[in-house]
Swiss-Prot record:
UniProt protein name: Large ribosomal subunit protein bL19
Top-level taxon in the UniProt lineage: Bacteria
One CC-aspect GO term: cytosolic large ribosomal subunit
Taxonomic lineage from the root: Bacteria, Bacillati, Bacillota, Bacilli, Lactobacillales
PROSITE patterns cross-referenced by the UniProt entry: RIBOSOMAL_L19
């Protein structure tokens, strides 16, 4: 990688990101701007994928809200996310959990790991 690009991206990387992967349940505190006000909106769900590397790394969180599946994709190093909390560590055997989109109720549960 070009040293100039590398030096620019190192300044943008966040160091307060907890370790998490697909299958973990996370609580994302996202900053939302509404007009002139800014507030924090909490989005809690299961991480179904994590892709990319470096400054462009992203993760997708899925939750069920009102019986409808909602997915949001966040960049890991964005300043729009105030903090990420890991609520529960899940035990899965895949890196991408897109099959959860077709499952409902108890079938969509993920086994928990005690850490």
């Amino acid at each position: 990688m070009n040293p100039l690009i590398q030096s620019l991206t190192e300044g943008q990387l966040r160091s307060d990101i907890p370790e998490f992967r697909a299958g973990d349940t996370v609580r994302v505190h996202a900053k939302v701007v509404e007009g002139t006000r800014e507030r924090i909106q909490i989005f809690e769900g299961v991480v179904i994928s994590r892709k990319g590397q470096g400054i462009s790394e992203m993760y997708t969180v899925r939750k069920i809200s009102g019986g409808i599946g909602v997915e949001r994709t966040f960049p890991i190093h964005t300043p729009r996310v105030d903090k990420i909390e890991v609520v529960r560590y899940g035990k899965v055997r895949r890196a991408k959990l897109y099959y959860l989109r077709a499952l409902q109720g108890k079938a969509a549960r993920i086994k928990e790991i005690r850490r």
